[in-house]
């Protein structure tokens, strides 16, 4: 993780700490049971993938969405270019509130069955 690894709330050091808490055995970091990026996603449920443009995890999220699409899984892949990691939970700017509203609308449409995948 190089892009946006510092200065945008979530840092490389904090992500490494979280990964160590989640999966201390580095031999398992690419285990399909630990990360869907390494799993067969054929036939999984439709997915909504929302990322922030300044999120160090953006590329990972977008790669997952692409993997789903390549497997024929219905997916909405939406990157909010001007947002950081956690923007949905800390919606304190006009743009983050607007992004959160769009997410809420999309999730609601998906739950109602009104989303055009």
Positions of PLM-derived features:
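Alpha/beta-hydrolase superfamily serine-hydrolase fold, recognizing
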Residues: 1-117
């Amino acid at each position: 993780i190089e892009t946006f690894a510092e200065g945008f709330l979530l840092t490389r050091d904090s992500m490494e700490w979280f990964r160590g808490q989640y999966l201390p055995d580095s031999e398992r970091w690419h285990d399909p049971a630990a990360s869907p990026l390494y799993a067969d996603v054929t036939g999984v449920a439709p997915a909504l993938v929302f990322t922030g443009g300044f999120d160090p995890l953006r590329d990972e999220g977008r790669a997952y969405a692409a993997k789903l699409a390549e497997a024929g899984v219905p997916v909405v892949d939406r990157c909010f270019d001007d947002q950081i990691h956690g923007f949905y939970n800390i919606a304190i700017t006009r743009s983050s509130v607007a992004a959160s509203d769009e997410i809420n609308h999309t999730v609601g449409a998906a739950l109602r069955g009104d989303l055009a995948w």
